[in-house]
Every structure is written in C-alpha cells, then in structure tokens.
Amino acid sequence: MAKTHEIKVERRADEGKGASRRLRHAGVIPAIVYGGELEPVSIQLNHEQIWLAQQNEWFYSSILDLNLNGDVQQVLLRDMQRHPFKQLIMHIDFQRVSANEKLSASVPLHFINEAISPAGKSSEVVVTHELNEVQVVCLPKDLPEFIEIDLSTLEVGAVIHLSEITLPAGVEIPELKLGKEHDVAVVIAKHGQVEADDVADEAAEGDAK
C-alpha cells in the first residue's frame, strides 16, 4: 500500500497575475488541481507548509492527499515553479489520480549495503550510480515511495542494469519494453586503474591533435 501524505489547501477565488502576486506577498502559493473526470480547480496553499514539505523526497514521488475542507483528493505533484534566486515557490500543478487507473511517476532509487560489498570494500574500485530515479507505471495503491537496490553482493567489474532491479508487486518500468538498448546501466563497479588509464588515453589523444 502506497504511503500518503495530507496537505491542507483552500479554494482560490481570484485568478490572474495580479491575484497570484498578492497571494505570494501574503505567504500563499497559487496552485491548480486537474485530471480525472472533474474540472480543474484553482487552489492555494500555505507557503511555509509546502516549503518544509518539498524538502522531503516523498513530496515528489508519493501520493498526496489534498484536503479541501474535508474533501480529500489524491494527487501527484506534476510541476512546481520556483523563483530563480529567492526561496520562493511561485506555482504548483497537481494531477488527480484514480484508484483504478495506472499512473506514471518518477521514483527515487535508494542504494544500500554498498560499503560491505566486495566492490565497496576495495579501495581501488569506483562505484558509480548512473541513475538516481526511475520512471514506473503502476496503480496508485502500488506506488512505492522509493525502490531499494541491495549492493551487498556487488563484485568488482560488475554492472547492474535496469532489468535487474527488483520491483515491488504491481510496478513496471515501461522503458524496458522499448528494447534491449533501453536496458541501461544503473550501477557500475569499475576498477580505479581502468578509469585512470581511460583518462590518460584521452589526454594522449588530445595532445596528438
């Protein structure tokens, strides 16, 4: 069961650039909820509440319960506009989700036990995480807050591909249906000397030009 987080919102009466500017001056974020069979609804949120929430990973990858005076709608964050240099959120888009319809979402990858793996124990090995998140398709109830990748058995020279990730029940990676060339590397454990040699070769090629 996907974990949800509740966020209290209010309906927004005034719209337009002037109204949005006044809301921001008052510490309120203009936002919109769309999708499903319902009409889009303009809402507003407390900036301080959202500023704290957006510092957490779950804000971007979990089902959110928008509570409008007791009317709760389940949504996903789809877009968040930030001020270019101020600590200010300008606008947020939320998309409604239906319990019976699959959704597409980006889910963070959490890598565990790297330090105790054969590759992690070697001072001569460089372990790189090529991806930090993955796009998945699933029903809302199956959406994971994150996907854990156990690296405890990672060997020197090993490569973990997208197809090797253990997924929770009901979760799919649509990228894998597009062909073998989309089965990209997620983790690479490369011997440090190999990397140093590659750098040296590139430098030599540059000098020769």
From Swiss-Prot:
> Is RNA-binding included in the keywords of this UniProt record?
yes
Query: Can you supply a Gene Ontology BP term from the record?
Result: translation
Classification via PANTHER family? RIBOSOMAL PROTEIN L25/GLN-TRNA SYNTHETASE, ANTI-CODON-BINDING DOMAIN-CONTAINING PROTEIN (PTHR33284), RIBOSOMAL PROTEIN L25_GLN-TRNA SYNTHETASE, ANTI-CODON-BINDING DOMAIN-CONTAINING PROTEIN (PTHR33284:SF1)
Check the record and name the CDD domains matching this protein. Answer: Ribosomal_L25_TL5_CTC (cd00495)
UniProt KW keywords: Ribonucleoprotein, Ribosomal protein, RNA-binding, rRNA-binding
| Cellular component GO terms held in the UniProt record | cytosolic large ribosomal subunit
* Stated role: This is one of the proteins that binds to the 5S RNA in the ribosome where it forms part of the central protuberance.
The encoding gene is rplY
Which organism was this protein described from? Xanthomonas campestris pv. campestris (strain ATCC 33913 / DSM 3586 / NCPPB 528 / LMG 568 / P 25)
Protein name, per record: Large ribosomal subunit protein bL25
How does this protein assemble? Answer: Part of the 50S ribosomal subunit; part of the 5S rRNA/L5/L18/L25 subcomplex. Contacts the 5S rRNA. Binds to the 5S rRNA independently of L5 and L18.
